From Swiss-Prot:
Disulfide bonds: none annotated. Belongs to the bacterial ribosomal protein bL36 family. GO terms for cellular component: chloroplast; ribonucleoprotein complex; ribosome. Its main location: plastid. GO terms for molecular function: structural constituent of ribosome. Keywords: Chloroplast, Plastid, Ribonucleoprotein, Ribosomal protein. This is Large ribosomal subunit protein bL36c. The gene is rpl36. NCBIfam families: rpmJ_bact. It comes from Thalassiosira pseudonana. It is found in: Plastid, Chloroplast. InterPro entries: Ribosomal_bL36 (IPR000473), Ribosomal_bL36_sp (IPR035977).
């Protein structure tokens, strides 16, 4: 899980979602998981 100020899709499989008021990226590739900090 990467925590960064701006989250971007890293591939076509990435999905940007909102959980508990936080913007997150979920993907089949676990390296692409991100959360806005």
């Amino acid at each position: 899980m990467k925590v960064r100020p701006s989250v971007k899709k890293m591939c076509e499989k990435c999905r940007v979602i909102k959980r508990h008021g936080k913007i997150m990226v979920i993907c089949q590739n676990p390296k692409h998981k991100q959360r806005q900090g």
